[in-house]
Structures are given as C-alpha cells and as structure tokens.
Amino acid sequence: MDIQTEMTAPPLSGGLDPAQARDAADAVRNAIYRATILLDSQKWDEWLALCADNFVYDIKAWSPEINYDMTYLHGSRKDLEALIRLLPKHNTDHSPLTRHTTIYTVDVADEGATAKGVSAFIVFQHLLDGTNSHIDAGESRLFLVGKYYDTFRIENGQALFTSRETRLENRRLDKGSHWPI
C-alpha cells in the first residue's frame, strides 16, 4: 500500500494566506522594535510617524490600595504632538532611558488589515542629575517594568500604531518622566 500525505502549514490567521499573515506579523514586530529605538533616541516626531492619525496612547497601572486603574497619561496623537512640543520647556529629568522590549504575541486579524501585539518592557534610567547628583550621577537603575498592549492598522506592508496601552507594574513615576515610555 502506497500512501502519500502532503504536509501543509495551517493558516496562521483565519482565512488569510500564511505568507501574508507572516508579512503582516513581521511588519508589526518591526514597528514595535523601531518604536523602542526611536523612544530611546528621543526622536519623538519619528516615533509619532509610526502612529496613525487616530492613535491613542495610555499609561496605566493597577492600584491594589484603591482597587482601581490609575491613569498617568491619556492622549490622542494631537495631544502627544502638543506634549512633545511643550515638555522641553518644563523641569524634566534629562537622564536618558534605555528600553528593552520583548515581543510576546502578534495576532493578525483574519482580513489582514489589523493586528494586536503584546510585549514586555524594562526601562533603565542612566542618572545624570537630581537631588543626589554628586552621589548618583553615572549610575544606571531599573526605572520601570511593564507591558505594551498595541493595536495596529496594516497598510501597504507597514504597521501603524492605532493604540498603545503602556501598563506599568510599578506605580511611581519620578519628576520629569512625562515623556512617552
């Protein structure tokens, strides 16, 4: 008896062609990692260029004391553009931040036009100034830990952020940490 079986990969996402689903997932991963690099470099306008016009950004943390979500920042793309223009005029901590992002999941919708991603992040702060700058300057410390919950619109092979919820595990943000995380 001669039986032949053909092995085919199951579709990665509903009825979407597997190659298209892989390309869309790669575009999402590229957008997440590119966003990390641009945020580290404080290239705010280039970071916003990765975002759709209807982009919404949130920084939140769960508070067990009040049994409620705390919202540190909520804004549209227009709100973030204004924030980025104004922040250099504020008293800010100029210590650079370095993010380490690890993508957990990328789920491309059946039609291939939208996707969701979940990533973990760790942010290190490299101290330059502050109350104890004579002691702390030059030190690097763990600053934030959390997850990104992103949604995307995929157009012409590129993934544009339509929302990012930055969900913090820690609940203390220092002075001058108003920049997008």
Curated annotation (Swiss-Prot):
Enzyme kind, highest EC tier: oxidoreductase
Induction: The msmABCD operon is induced by methanesulfonic acid (MSA).
Keyword Signal: no
Pfam family, one: SnoaL_4
Catalytic activity, reaction form: methanesulfonate + NADH + O2 = sulfite + formaldehyde + NAD(+) + H2O
Gene3D superfamilies: 3.10.450.50
Principal location listed in the UniProt entry: cytoplasm
Notes on activation and inhibition: MSAMO is inhibited by metal chelators (such as bathophenanthroline, bathocuprione, neocuprione, alpha-alpha-dipyridil and sodium EDTA) and by sodium azide, sodium arsenate and potassium cyanide.
UniProt keywords, alphabetically: Cytoplasm, Monooxygenase, NAD, Oxidoreductase
Single GO MF annotation: methanesulfonate monooxygenase activity
Catalytic activity, EC: 1.14.13.111
Described function: Methanesulfonate monooxygenase (MSAMO) mediates the primary degradation of methanesulfonic acid (MSA) to produce formaldehyd and inorganic sulfite by initial hydroxylation of the carbon atom prior to spontaneous cleavage of the unstable hydroxymethanesulfonic acid. MSAMO has a restricted substrate range that includes only the short-chain aliphatic sulfonates (methane- to butanesulfonate) and excludes all larger molecules, such as arylsulfonates and aromatic sulfonates. All MSAMO components are required for enzyme activity.
Protein's name according to its UniProt entry: Methanesulfonate monooxygenase hydroxylase subunit beta
Organism: Methylosulfonomonas methylovora
